[in-house]
Regions:
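N-terminal glutamine amidotransferase
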Residues: 1-126
Length: 126
């Protein structure tokens, strides 16, 4: 067996209830994305080369976009990808952002399945 090293990290969040449940219970439909951020930050360590996140909207209408991804390089990649996602929401009013139905139909990264990846260079060759 090989000795343990800092390998790449993976985090996944699968929401089992509709986004409206999380809006009502926690005050935001972004509950899954917030949990993914927290899980990725807990894995954040030195040697990080980059990170990425993906989201799947399982309730998307036929023909509409249902998969989203964002990637970044560098030691602050986690902050960068989540900041980029938040910038996509700046053109929407707070009423639109708090409307679960609007969010799920129109906003990127509004979905039920999230996955994050952290890439490390301390495991060997890049």
């Amino acid at each position: 067996m090989e000795p343990l090293k800092h390998e790449c990290g993976v985090a996944m969040v699968r929401l089992l209830k509709p986004l409206s449940y999380y809006q009502e219970k926690y005050g935001t439909w972004m509950y899954g994305m917030n949990k993914l951020y927290l899980m990725m930050e807990k894995q954040h360590n030195r040697g990080q080369e980059g990170a990425g996140m993906a989201c799947v909207n399982l309730e998307a209408a036929p023909g509409s976009e249902y998969m989203f991804r964002e990637r970044a390089e560098g030691s602050n990649a986690i902050t960068e990808i989540f900041g980029t996602v938040q910038k996509k929401y700046k053109d929407y009013s707070s009423a639109q952002l708090n409307d679960v139905d609007f969010a799920q139909r129109n906003l990127p990264f509004a979905g039920e399945w999230y996955m994050g990846h952290l890439r490390y260079s301390t495991t060997g060759k890049s």
